[in-house]
């Protein structure tokens, strides 16, 4: 979920009742308040909700699921494997599947690194 605030969000935000928000991809920017003309600092970021302790594994899974549902993930993997195993013979389809799978794996690796860095920063 995309979020915006004029206060820097904490990386891990307890919501009560065992729920937490993980705020990531936090970007600080300046904008002009349309009512006062004053330049203010705002923060744009992504948010996912997890339950119980916000562990590395839970946060990685939540970020991946916020981008890819299970069916999309399986489709990417199956299309790639169909090309590798020769089930799909169209060269363009194979290349598209290979690129989609590589992009997915890159996203997962970047997500894992980001979550690890955020957890270290959050203490």
Residue spans for each PLM region:
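A preference for well-ordered globular domain cores
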Residues: 2-123
């Amino acid at each position: 979920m995309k979020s915006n605030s004029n206060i820097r969000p904490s990386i891990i935000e307890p919501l009560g009742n065992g729920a937490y928000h993980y705020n990531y991809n936090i970007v600080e920017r300046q904008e002009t308040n349309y009512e006062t003309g004053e330049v203010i600092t705002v923060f744009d970021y992504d948010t996912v909700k997890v339950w119980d302790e916000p562990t590395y594994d839970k946060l990685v899974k939540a970020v991946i699921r916020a981008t890819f549902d299970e069916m999309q993930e399986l489709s990417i993997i199956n299309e790639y494997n169909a090309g590798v195993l020769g089930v799909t013979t169209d060269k363009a389809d194979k290349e598209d599947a290979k690129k989609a799978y590589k992009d997915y794996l890159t996203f997962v690796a970047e997500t894992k690194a980001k979550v690890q860095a955020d957890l270290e920063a959050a203490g």
